[in-house]
Amino acid sequence: ALAIAVPVTVVSAIGAATKFGVVIKSGAAFERLGGIRHLAVDKTGTLTRNRPEVTAIVAAHGFDDAQVLAWAAAVEQHSTHPLAAAIAAAGRGTPAAQDVAEEAGHGIGGLVDGRRVAVGSPRWIDAGPLKARVEDLEAEGQTCVLVTVDGFLAGAIGVRDELRPEVPEVVRTLRDQGVEVSMLTGDNSRTAAALAKLAGIGDVHAELRPEDKARIVAGFSETSPTAMIGDGINDAPALAGATV
């Protein structure tokens, strides 16, 4: 009777999960989930609402806000990064760039009206005279990207994606059940720390590349069963290396 009851229970649970938008690929994965002792989570689009909005534009000397946004939107239309959609939407109507190339974890570049435009993180592009302003925005919980035109710094754009309201309670519940929670993000340490504080997450790993996330998750998995929750192509290696 037990041999029959267990599969039925698992199938029933998998069916119930689909009603909440959760797709479980196999009963084995469902069973492994019960033994998870460590949860690694991405920030953007996972802990946050996935409704990013442009909240600040800072133009460098000789440029203006509208120019900076238009150039950034032209190349970000081609990006798969969760925050790119916010910039593209804010600059709606901007012609798309040509000859676009994206490097995961760094940024994206292309030709806009014959000018070479690049949009990327402050780790990839030097903030120069805008460094102090960028750091202030990051400390407020905004994610900043820098925009260059023909190799010259044109400006910075701040994007904010609010924390999902249920996250603090979920983190507390997991901790009460003996599950450690860690944040893994490619974002800067200031923005990550600001959001982690709101979420109640104490273990924060920021400024990570996709391979860094995969390495950290592999390390977690060596000591305890680990689940990874992520979003986007940047998290694919880490997702593949997790227990679930």
Task: Show which residues each predicted segment covers.
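Cytosolic catalytic regions of ATP/NTP-dependent phosphoryl-transfer enzymes
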Residues: 38-128, 142-154, 188-197, 234, ...
